[in-house]
Amino acid sequence: MSTIIAAPGRVSLDDLARVYAGATLELDPSYWPDVEAAAAIVAKAAQGAEPVYGINTGFGKLASKRIPPDQTAQLQRNLILSHCCGVGPVTPEAVVRLMMALKIISLGRGASGVRREIIEQLQAMLARGVCPFVPQQGSVGASGDLAPLAHMTAVMIGEGQAFVDGRLVPGREALAHAGLAPVTLGPKEGLALINGTQFSTAYALAGLLRAHDLLKAALVTGALSVDAAMASTAPFRPEIQALRGHPGQIAAGRVLTELLDGSAIRLSHLEGDERVQDPYCLRCQPQVAGAALDLLTQTARTLVTEANAVTDNPLVLVVTGEIISGGNFHAEPVAFAADQIALALSELGAISERRIATLVDPALNFGLPPFLTPQPGLNSGFMIAEVTAAALFAENKQRALPCSIDSTPTSANQEDHVSMAAHAARRLHDMADNLAHIIGIELLVAAQGIELRVPHGTSAALSAVIGALRVHVPALENDRYMADDLAKAAAIVAGGVLADAARDALGRDPFPKLG
């Protein structure tokens, strides 16, 4: 397991992707002086006569309540326990680990006022496999992700529950298993740990990474569909894309051209084809996939900025010694980014579903049998697989409606406008699951269509993709139990097998990165 040495403010998307894939993260030691200086400022304020929010006061609507110095530790402990109000399914371990890493990065900026040992506790938990049990539901994305982060923090103090080696155990037991002891929270430390956008941001980043992988898969299956339908590659020419100028469109057109290069199917109908133009789902792939790519690139910038941000409250300004209340905990940028990712996921599924429908329809598929079965009538072929794709697309279309506009006041109207970033980000994973199935169905249908075009074959890159599919799913000759085929195809798509096969066949990586 690799370890990333994080310089808060300069952590990259590649770094975050590595954490999501299982790497650990530690703070660059050069950041400890600012961390310790901010903690000293908080410790001094806790002993002073002036009220400072979250240090010697209550929280939220109770901010006017003064807390004496001898009760500040109890104040922080009570805050954590009272805010462990999450409900619903457990958050996936990869997302929780990413959330923990994001909190380390944020605290490491030296503007939160926590002691070094608090960050070191999080680092050790991450490195030693202590994964807090964090329910998915309960955050409205302002004031930060209070409930989810409280469940994380509870384990740090020996409360709550955590997974260790796949077992759910009490927090204190999880720490002991990892050779750790509970920490006692000092002034402001509980507030700094739970007041932030790290839960929403972790979920949104995970959704972004999955969306990018699915975009690459959709370019591959889109290219397969072009050959299966004996469609034209002329709309993918670089001159067409350059005249519009969008970077994503240019990149998508280039990928489609590379994937289809050398196709004998394409050469077989360069002349004498009576069709003047192909349907939009085939012809406009650079425009649609390219727009999705540009949107994902934009959201990547937003989420990487947020990953490096300090999003708790109040904040400690080490240079001036001030402790200032602000609103960095409001996750509106994350909510907007998640809503945009949802649009990309929905549209990639929408156009894929239309390509599936084109290929199974004998009126549109240019000579292929109905539903791509050699014996239509006796066999139904991919008839209901297409219906499943339509059902999944309809679900994603509904889920793509924006969450960020659905604010509701909380905390006795003190927190009267919230972002709903957590819900916006969480729903991306259901959408990604649906999209993987849609693209998987297109993979099955397009591969079948190409194989029915014998004696003509597709390009070397796409032949390699079909070969990777056929290791797991044979061609459909007669009707069989289809659910297993669909599940295997979705797993192939989600696992990045299509992009890997194409990349290996081409000897280079044709797929665009984010940014």
From Swiss-Prot:
The keyword Cytoplasm applies. This is Histidine ammonia-lyase. There is a cross-link at residues 142-144 (5-imidazolinone (Ala-Gly)). Its main location: cytoplasm. The keyword Acetylation does not apply. Keywords: Cytoplasm, Histidine metabolism, Lyase. Its EC number is 4.3.1.3. HAMAP family: His_ammonia_lyase. It comes from Bradyrhizobium sp. (strain BTAi1 / ATCC BAA-1182). The gene is hutH. InterPro entries: Aromatic_Lyase, Fumarase/histidase_N, HutH, L-Aspartase-like, Phe/His_NH3-lyase_AS. The modification 2,3-didehydroalanine (Ser) is found at residue 143. Pfam families: Lyase_aromatic. It is found in: Cytoplasm.
